[in-house]
């Protein structure tokens, strides 16, 4: 019988993926009642995505976290129409979700130069406002970063995710022979000979209870949401966080990881998934791998070994299972090819689904137009033709 265990964990590093900001649009300019002049509109506040920006840089650059746009120019004899106040642009990284104080989503920034209006400037003084300017909009906004990647690495600490990322890409994450080496998400890119690029996100190792925010689980589980596919990375020799916690076999780690994803957000289980069985250079690795494969072929035959609350509603069906060694390089090329093949298949399926949807919409549109009753003009014309 597999039992649950709990343990205290040290705090993660100073990686920032959430910020709360105060924003205010600029006030409008004064109107000129005697000549009917209109004051300029206050500047607006925008959130703009930039590729090489981080929330930590934003916080360091603007420690007060207050962003106020410029005031509109007053109307005057030499310029009856006042000019608009200067807009304020807040630089943020790509992958930001912007919400208001009530949690309502204002918008998302998924590529460079995407921009969202978060606070409008006030109107300038004009006849409708008795030539008095209006104040700009005040708004508290929350920036929530979710990394965007093709593949997200999922695994317990010390499974070799960082070593794997350094093998398949040019990323240089911190690597050491102890748990929790990775303290913040890392992004790398797999480069192929035909210049195809696939982005991979290495997340800090999950732990049992991550769905309840143990080990800051929510802080890093959310980054999996925007990955197209998941790559489970498990240690063939199993995992034990410390001498005070229970040892887990490779099969048990897969089941427990699946359960953590399910409890955090069920939709994550619907993502296409691959499995990399790491550390195949260790003694007895081949025997353990054959045992793991037999367990994965019929997982339901072994679920009775787990406590009921640890069994996921559905087990993950891996598209590819690849034995690898991030130390010797064994299986790395095969893994890279499987990742690309899986993503290409997913893209083809999405394109086919989109094409079918477009054809269905076209057919519905044609059907509706053919069943519409003829217009009065059409009926009158036909009678005249008969006469």
Curated annotation (Swiss-Prot):
Q: Name one Pfam family in it.
A: MMR_HSR1
Q: Which UniProt keywords apply?
A: Chromosome, GTP-binding, Nucleotide-binding, Nucleus, Ribosome biogenesis
In this entry, which stretches build a coiled coil?
none
Identification of the protein by name: GTP-binding protein 10
Query: What range(s) does the Obg domain occupy?
Result: 13-148
A biological process term (GO) from this entry? ribosome biogenesis
Q: Which GO terms describe its molecular function?
A: GTP binding; GTPase activity; magnesium ion binding; RNA binding
Which CDD domains does this entry report, sorted A to Z?
Obg (cd01898)
* Originating species: Homo sapiens (Human)
Could you tell me which residue ranges the OBG-type G domain spans?
Answer: 149-344
């Amino acid at each position: 019988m597999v039992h649950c265990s709990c343990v205290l964990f040290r705090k993660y590093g100073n990686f920032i993926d959430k910020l709360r900001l105060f924003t205010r649009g600029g006030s409008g300019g004064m109107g000129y009642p005697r000549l009917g002049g209109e004051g300029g509109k206050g500047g607006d506040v925008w959130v703009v995505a930039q590729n090489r920006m981080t929330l930590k840089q934003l916080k360091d650059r603007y420690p007060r976290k207050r962003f106020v746009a410029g005031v509109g120019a007053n109307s005057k004899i030499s310029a009856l129409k006042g000019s608009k106040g200067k807009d304020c642009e807040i630089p943020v990284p790509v992958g930001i979700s912007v919400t208001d104080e009530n949690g309502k989503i204002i918008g998302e920034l998924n590529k460079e130069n995407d921009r969202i209006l978060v606070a409008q400037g006030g109107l300038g003084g004009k006849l409708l406002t008795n030539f008095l300017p209006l104040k700009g909009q005040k708004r508290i906004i929350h920036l929530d970063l979710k990394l965007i990647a093709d593949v997200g690495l999922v695994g317990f600490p010390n499974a070799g995710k960082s070593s794997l990322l350094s093998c398949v890409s040019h990323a240089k994450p911190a690597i050491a022979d102890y748990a929790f080496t990775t303290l913040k998400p890392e992004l790398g890119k797999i480069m192929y000979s035909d210049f195809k690029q696939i982005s991979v996100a290495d997340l800090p190792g999950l732990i049992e209870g991550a769905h309840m925010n143990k080990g800051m689980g929510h802080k890093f589980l959310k980054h999996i949401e925007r990955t197209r596919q998941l790559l489970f990375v498990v240690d063939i020799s199993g995992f034990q966080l410390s001498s005070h916690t229970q040892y887990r076999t490779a099969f048990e780690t897969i089941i427990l990881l699946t359960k953590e994803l399910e409890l955090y957000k069920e939709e994550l289980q619907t993502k296409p998934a691959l499995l990399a069985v790491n550390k195949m250079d260790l003694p007895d690795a081949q025997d353990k791998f054959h045992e793991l494969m037999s367990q994965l072929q019929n997982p339901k035959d072994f679920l009775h070994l787990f406590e009921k609350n640890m069994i996921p509603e559905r087990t993950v069906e891996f598209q590819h299972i690849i034995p690898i060694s991030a130390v010797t390089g064994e299986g790395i090329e095969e893994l890279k090819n499987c990742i690309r093949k899986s993503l290409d298949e997913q893209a083809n399926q999405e394109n086919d689904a989109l094409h079918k949807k477009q054809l269905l919409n076209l057919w519905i549109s044609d059907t509706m137009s053919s069943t519409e009753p003829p217009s009065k003009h059409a009926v009158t014309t036909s009678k005249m033709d008969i006469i």
